[in-house]
């Protein structure tokens, strides 16, 4: 069922061969809706290398796991109701295929369906530096309605562990999908009677920021 019928969002998460598998695992663990998973061949390999997990370890977190070669799949058709496709991590090659209309895998095909049906498409792209073509492809997809998020985690909450850093970045993905993130930048300030500009650095740090007068880019 779609969100309008079941009350839950139906989401396909695609994992490709770019670095960044911990982001995908953290997102799956959020249990944000009726989530389905598609793994590419290289996505499986990177998942094992970066997290030590295999496909079977993720089965309890999702409704079903699909092969990326399964083009005879409900997500390949716009006639089936789903709310979003999230590709995390998304390789430069995968982004290029989607930008140029190549839907030769379940992940790329479902992304194209999301675009044509005006459903949410989120690409978490992990690559550095970007070639010029990647910027052009990202711009094209953005104009078509996709949300392109470079895999660039924030530091303004002063994470103490790698897990905290990953979770803070996943909050960004969750927010883009329309869910409430666990933590927001300076959220406490909204409930404070004193403006942030009047807080000392110590007070700002107590609120989870290193500089009370700093502003994000």
Describe each PLM feature range:
Residues 1-122, 126-217:
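A cross-family phosphate/adenosyl-ligand binding-site feature
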């Amino acid at each position: 069922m779609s969100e309008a019928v079941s009350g839950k969002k139906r989401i396909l998460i695609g994992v490709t061969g770019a670095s960044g598998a911990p982001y995908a695992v953290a997102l799956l663990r959020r249990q944000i809706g009726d989530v389905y998973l598609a793994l590419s061949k290289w996505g499986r390999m990177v998942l094992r290398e970066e997290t030590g997990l295999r496909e079977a370890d993720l089965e309890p977190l999702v409704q079903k796991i699909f092969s990326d070669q399964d083009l005879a799949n409900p997500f390949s058709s716009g006639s089936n109701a789903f709310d979003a496709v999230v590709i995390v991590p998304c390789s430069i090659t995968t982004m290029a295929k989607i930008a140029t209309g190549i839907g030769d895998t379940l992940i790329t095909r479902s992304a194209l369906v999301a675009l044509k049906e005006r459903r949410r498409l989120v690409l978490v792209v992990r690559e550095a530096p970007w070639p010029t073509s990647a910027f052009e492809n990202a711009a094209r997809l953005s104009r078509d309605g996709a949300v392109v998020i470079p895999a660039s985690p924030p530091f303004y909450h002063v994470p103490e562990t790698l897990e905290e850093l990953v979770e803070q970045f996943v909050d960004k993905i969750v927010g883009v999908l329309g869910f409430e993130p666990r933590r927001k930048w300076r959220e406490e300030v909204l409930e404070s009677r004193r403006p942030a500009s009047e807080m000392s650095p110590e007070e700002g740090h107590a609120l989870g920021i290193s500089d009370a007068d700093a502003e994000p880019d």
